[in-house]
């Protein structure tokens, strides 16, 4: 498994952990990292994804809701919504990652951790977001570099 795939999987698990506990604090992220130690090489990308998603979550969730049909983010399966949050963050803010790579990775992570339908569900929504980004239909407010929240 590649470094970025491992970072994505751990980021999804960390976001899931914080989502289930309704606590997205730096202390909760630290608790996750204490129990599920990200490999050193995966750590920078892992932190970029987690912190980036948390910082941009209102914007990301609004896009997911806008491009899903009759779904509210909070009603989606926890795995699916956090996988999509990561993919949308990558498409909006990680210019070095082609959108199709973000989508394929999201589908694979969704299939691994979600339900039988997760891959198709995730693909349908984030591919619509990708097309809207490519058409210039989405305004992107790019944040400054995301801090690492002092997680060691």
Predicted feature locations:
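N-terminal interaction/assembly modules
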Residues: 1-152
């Amino acid at each position: 498994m590649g470094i970025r795939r491992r970072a994505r999987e751990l980021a999804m698990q960390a976001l899931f952990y914080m989502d289930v506990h309704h606590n997205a604090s730096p202390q909760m992220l630290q608790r996750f990292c204490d129990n599920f130690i990200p490999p050193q090489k995966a750590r920078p990308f892992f932190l970029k994804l987690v912190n980036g998603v948390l910082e941009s979550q209102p914007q990301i969730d609004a896009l997911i809701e806008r491009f899903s049909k009759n779904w509210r983010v909070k009603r989606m399966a926890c795995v699916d919504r956090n996988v999509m949050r990561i993919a949308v963050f990558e498409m909006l803010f990680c210019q070095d990652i082609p959108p199709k790579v973000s989508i394929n990775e999201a589908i694979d992570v969704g299939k691994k951790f979600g339900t039988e339908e997760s891959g198709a569900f995730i693909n349908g929504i984030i591919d619509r977001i990708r097309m809207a980004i490519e058409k210039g239909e989405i305004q992107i407010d790019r944040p400054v570099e995301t801090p690492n929240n002092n997680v060691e």
